[in-house]
Amino acid sequence: MAIRFTADAHFGHENVIAMDGRPFGSAEEMDEELVRRWNETVRKGDIVYHLGDFAMSGEPEYLSSIAERLNGKIRLVFGNHDSGLRRAMRNGRLTAKAAVKFEDARDYREVRHDHMKFLMSHYPMPCYNGRHHTKNRENETIFMLHGHVHATPEHDMIRNLAIFQKPAMQIVNVGCMLWDYRPISPEQAVSACRMARGCASVGECLRKWGMGDEGCSGCAFGSYRLGADRFGCMKGFQLTADMIPRLDLSER
């Protein structure tokens, strides 16, 4: 059994295609491709933590039809677009097969896995539990996972602030649009946090993100793959040394 993380599938949400620059022609096409990529990645015995905004529709029949097709058990963290799903679960209106698929649902989670601790919220939480546990380097085993901000300037801002804090925030946006529309493994989440460590300068970190003198190449942090060319890597919020002169960036 493996565990996976994802967020912001937005099944059935036509408008999110343009918002994220998703490569789908319709909500129906998007649904089919999201299900296909999920099932290519997730085995039947796996557990997937979905961190909010599972579907735009609150119709129990629609929600059930999607859930029944997905591999694995789904442990939900509710997001701001999950009121319909929350209501359907509370009122027992999902099919029996779908109700079993949604194994558990909460607003916030903390899970231990392989000596690491994953904190999960739909919303990014820079001041997460354990953030300042610097003694015995415990904070290096704590990771804050979130969704909500998609591939937006807010995503870039949080990423920038996370890396150049001391100690660095270990915060990862697991939104599906950043990860090829597939749930990711704990190892992918951890590597996304740690790949920028050891940067000698802001410029080196930008080069690791694929941004050189020619500008943004459209890639992102670690394994991230941004889906929206209109935002791209660092386009929304470009961090430079003169913007934060009080931080010693030479040591990061």
Language model features with spans:
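Core catalytic region of metal-dependent phosphoesterases/phosphodiesterases
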Residues: 2-108
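Single, functionally critical "micro-switch" positions that shape active/binding sites
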Residues: 7, 147, 226
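Activation segment
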Residues: 13-15, 58, 129, 153-155, ...
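A short, polar/proline- and glycine-enriched secondary-structure boundary/capping micro-motif
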Residues: 16, 129-133, 244
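Structured loop/turn residues at beta-strand edges in well-structured enzyme cores
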Residues: 43, 72, 139-140, 169, ...
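Conserved residues at the C-terminal ends of beta-strands
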Residues: 51, 147, 222
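Conserved beta-sheet core of the metallophosphoesterase superfamily
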Residues: 98-200
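Cysteine-centered metal-binding/redox modules
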Residues: 198-252
